A protein has these predicted regions:
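Bacterial Sec-dependent N-terminal signal peptides
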Residues: 1-27
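Predominantly the C-terminal beta-signal and adjacent terminal strand-loop region
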Residues: 99-105, 196-228
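Residues that define the transmembrane beta-barrel architecture of outer-membrane proteins
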Residues: 45, 68-76, 134-138, 157-159, ...
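Gram-negative (and chloroplast) outer-membrane scaffold detector with strong preference
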Residues: 86-181
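Residues on the lipid-exposed face of transmembrane beta-strands in outer-membrane beta-barrel proteins
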Residues: 51-55, 78-82, 92, 140-146, ...
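Short loop/turn motifs that connect adjacent beta-strands in outer-membrane beta-barrel proteins
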Residues: 36-46, 87, 148-160, 193-196
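Extracellular loop and loop/strand-boundary signature of outer-membrane beta-barrel proteins
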Residues: 37, 61-66, 123-131, 171-175, ...
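Short glycine/proline- and aromatic-enriched beta-strand/turn motifs that initiate or cap beta-hairpins
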Residues: 21-81, 174
Length: 228
């Protein structure tokens, strides 16, 4: 009897590690389909870098006196960002803008004047000259991908449409140098070629304080740009 009990106990001890190993390797994986839920993951997951080139128009005190074609100037941008959910993301973007317009030649050194008179606008009471200057705008935006927020949450969708709002800091690099808080808003459209590459089209408006172009007026200033 004692010998049988000993053999039974020995068999039980031998089987214990096998049961422990089996239970220790069992893994349960859950996938969330909640498009509003923020998942904790690696910092680099769902991050992106974007580059853009296009055109912009500045809205200053006298710029409307210049034809549209003469006000159109180059715009460049670079951004880094991250999508926390399929519908909500953030980015930090820098825009380099060349601005063209008009300034009033009533002081010894008109703001950003090229010295060239605006045809038909350089007579008595106007004294307008063409102007141009370079500026930068660094801003942080919150983006909302409406096709995922209000759609069927299809992560394989080729198209994304993301309105955004943000705040930043704009600075004119040419004398007279000026700076301003910038309010940024716009619409970003994307076509996803594959999981790595996408083509973007970004229509962006910027609200700026009066005087950034070197002239004080009665209202705020702004910029409208399109890059892709």
């Amino acid at each position: 009897m004692t010998k049988k009990i000993f053999l039974t106990a020995l068999c039980a001890l031998a089987l214990c590690p096998a049961f422990a190993q089996t239970s220790g390797t069992e893994e349960k994986v859950e996938y969330s389909t909640d498009k509003y839920k923020v998942e904790t993951n690696s910092f680099w997951d769902n991050t992106f870098v974007s580059l853009g080139v296009g055109g912009n128009i500045y809205f200053g005190d006298h710029d409307k006196q210049v034809d549209f074609g003469k006000r159109l100037a180059p715009a460049f941008d670079i951004a880094v960002g991250k999508w926390f959910t399929p519908g909500i993301g953030v980015r930090v973007m820098y825009n380099y803008l060349k601005s063209k317009g008009a300034t009033q030649d009533v002081i010894s050194t008109p703001a950003h004047s090229t010295g060239e008179p605006v045809p038909g606008k350089d007579g008595w009471g106007q004294y307008l000259r063409y102007s141009k200057f370079n500026m930068g705008n660094l801003h942080a935006d919150v983006m909302f991908n409406v096709l995922h927020l209000f759609g069927d949450n299809n992560l394989n969708c080729k198209w994304d449409l993301s309105p955004y709002v943000g705040i930043g800091w704009a600075h004119v690099y040419d004398s007279p140098k000026k700076s301003s808080v910038s309010g940024n808003f716009g619409l970003l459209g994307s076509y996803n070629i594959n999981e790595t590459w996408a083509v973007n089209a970004d229509l962006r408006g910027v609200l700026l304080s009066d005087g950034l172009d070197g002239e004080k007026g009665a209202r705020a200033e702004g910029d409208l740009s399109f890059t892709s």
